[in-house]
């Protein structure tokens, strides 16, 4: 008898919460299936069924330890939270193409009561039940029917109640006979599921215990990162990410309040910064690449108006980290963190420049990955945005040429002194989507002799990347032409490099390994960088033009870019440091260029 009781012990949490166990498992499965993207190759989380089982069982175990009265209250609270979160999650997926994420939560926090009312009236219509929301509502309806089973039973006729009781008693007798075996099976599955889920649970714990949004993003680049596979986990992760972002926002606002401009000579009336995306200089024909991917930039260089810099690296190979380091007056190696220092557009605005930010990525959107959230949260914060920018575009575009239309709409606001920042989508994956099909000029056959070791699929991918680079060349050239008759200086740099079957490395995009070797640094951190000076600018500022040309072979890491920009504007401020300004006579060219704040780029050597 004691052995039987011991063997059936694993069944107690389920017996005491049978409705909870069954319907929460169904709810988890329905949510996973309802939020599976309708794209080729999309798959469910590989450990879904086992991890859902052990999570469900663990919740039942906790509930079973509560006194009966508290157990009922606990289940009611859990049902309310889990169903509400599930409905919100699948609704967001059906309406916006994304499950709950940090950006959605941030948008909710910035929504006032009027906007919330308009949203509810516009989007909460009966039609939503036809989508994924309807699946969750069906589970909820079945659960309600289950909860009302005793009331329904009492409404049956006496004969039907007796027949039902007989069947129930026979079923219970059969179940009692197999309880020991069922207990063993449940215990075995729980152990199996716990072991199989341990890695993901550890990964999720690392995400939830990260100390900054940047750390969260970096953890997500690891192959074994935690998967928040349930709506309630995604909600918790979104709340945590927003808490971390809010902490850095407070620091940035504090730094902004202390920012000061002592004087400004307005040396360069119009300064343009073009920030590209995922462009390593080894795919630029301007830097020696065999395929003609940058003919227009090369032509500008031959004209003498464009000065190409030869030794420039990015501080990170992640867009969000690059943006934080590029926008902050902080440089890697200085005391404190990036968010402890002012952002350079704030200083330009204080100095009297009209600052415009035109981006094809960092606008507040519901369907936004953590990477965009991490890079854009400080740019989209209402307080910081108002302190940095006078004008911004309101929409993103499929292709970067849409930004030129945005500029034309905002141009009249510029005034006599302007800083305009273009942020392109550039060569961001997926490469084939970065350029119109009609602009395809580079074909797979191009690589028959250049890269014969690549298979057909790889050569297609490479052609797409190089076509995206060629299209990017046309966009950059068109931006430069907007300023050819102005007293303007234009700086171009991508955020970081990109790999596309480089050498024998055999992969695309970037490798986010903590260890940085020579090849990784070469392909993912070395970037093109140049400065264009218009004919009018060259006539009016010969000394500064000469400085720009004289600095072209100096070492540079782009975290120091703001100090050069302040030099171009003639802004004097406590946060400006000449030793970080590549145009200054006091520039410290031997400052360690620490990639990811850890690896000295200039000490890396090729593998033998």
Predicted regions: what they are:
Residues 60, 405-408, 446-492, 531, ...:
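A long, amphipathic alpha-helix that forms part
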Residues 502, 545-552, 556-558, 570-604:
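Polar, surface-exposed loop/tail segments
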Residues 89, 390, 427, 498, ...:
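Extracellular glycan-modifying ectodomains
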Residues 1-219:
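Transmembrane and membrane-interface helices of multi-pass
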């Amino acid at each position: 008898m004691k052995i039987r009781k011991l063997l059936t012990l694993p069944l107690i949490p389920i017996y005491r919460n049978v409705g909870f166990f069954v319907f929460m498992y169904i709810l988890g499965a329905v949510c996973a299936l309802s939020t599976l993207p309708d794209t080729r190759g999309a798959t469910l989380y590989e450990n879904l069924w086992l991890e859902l089982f052990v999570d469900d069982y663990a919740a039942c175990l906790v509930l079973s330890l509560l006194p009966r009265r508290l157990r009922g209250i606990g289940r009611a609270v859990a049902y309310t939270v889990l169903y509400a979160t599930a409905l919100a999650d699948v609704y967001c997926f059906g309406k916006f193409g994304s499950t709950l994420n940090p950006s959605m939560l941030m948008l909710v926090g910035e929504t006032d009561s009027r906007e919330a009312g308009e949203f509810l009236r516009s989007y909460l219509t009966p039609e939503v039940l036809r989508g994924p929301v309807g699946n969750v509502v069906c589970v909820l309806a079945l659960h309600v029917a289950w909860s009302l089973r005793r009331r329904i039973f009492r409404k049956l006729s006496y004969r039907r109640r007796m027949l039902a009781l007989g069947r129930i008693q026979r079923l219970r007798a059969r179940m009692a006979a197999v309880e020991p075996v069922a207990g063993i099976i449940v215990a075995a599955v729980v152990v199996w599921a716990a072991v199989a889920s341990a890695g993901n649970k550890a990964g999720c714990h690392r995400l939830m215990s990260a100390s900054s949004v940047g750390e969260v993003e970096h953890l997500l680049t690891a192959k074994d990162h935690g998967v928040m596979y349930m709506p309630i986990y995604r909600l918790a992760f979104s709340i945590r990410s927003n808490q971390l972002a809010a902490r850095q926002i407070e620091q940035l606002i504090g730094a902004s309040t202390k920012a000061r401009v002592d004087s400004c000579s307005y040396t360069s009336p119009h300064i343009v910064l073009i920030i590209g995306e995922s462009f390593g200089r080894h795919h630029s024909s301007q830097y020696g690449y065999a395929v003609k991917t940058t003919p227009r930039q090369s032509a500008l260089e031959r004209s003498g108006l464009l000065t190409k810099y030869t030794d420039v690296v990015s501080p990170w190979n992640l867009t969000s980290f690059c943006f934080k380091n590029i926008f902050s007056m902080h440089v890697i190696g200085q005391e404190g963190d990036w968010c402890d220092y002012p952002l350079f557009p704030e200083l330009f605005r204080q100095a009297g420049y009209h600052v415009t930010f035109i981006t094809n990525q960092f606008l507040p959107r519901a369907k936004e990955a953590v990477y965009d959230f991490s890079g854009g949260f400080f740019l989209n914060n209402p307080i910081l945005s108002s302190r940095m920018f006078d004008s911004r575009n309101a929409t993103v575009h499929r292709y970067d040429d849409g930004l030129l239309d945005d500029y034309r709409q905002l141009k009249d606001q510029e005034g006599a002194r302007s800083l305009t920042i273009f942020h392109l989508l550039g060569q961001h994956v997926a490469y084939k989507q970065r350029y119109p099909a009609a602009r395809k000029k580079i074909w797979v056959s191009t690589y028959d002799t250049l890269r014969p070791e690549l298979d057909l699929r790889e050569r297609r991918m490479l052609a797409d990347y190089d076509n995206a680079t060629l299209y990017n060349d046309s966009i950059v050239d068109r931006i430069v032409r907007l300023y050819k008759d102005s007293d303007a200086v234009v700086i171009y740099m991508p955020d970081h490099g990109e790999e596309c079957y480089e050498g024998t490395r055999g992969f695309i995009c970037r490798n986010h390994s903590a260890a940085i070797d020579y090849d990784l640094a070469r392909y993912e951190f070395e970037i093109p960088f140049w400065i264009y000076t218009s004919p009018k600018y060259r006539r009016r500022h010969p000394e500064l033009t000469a400085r720009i040309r004289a600095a072209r072979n100096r070492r540079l890491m782009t975290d120091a870019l703001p100090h050069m920009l302040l030099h171009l504007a003639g802004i004097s401020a406590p946060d400006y440091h000449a030793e970080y300004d590549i145009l200054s006579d006091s520039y410290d060219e031997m400052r360690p260029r620490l990639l990811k704040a850890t690896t000295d780029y200039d000490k890396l050597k090729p593998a033998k």
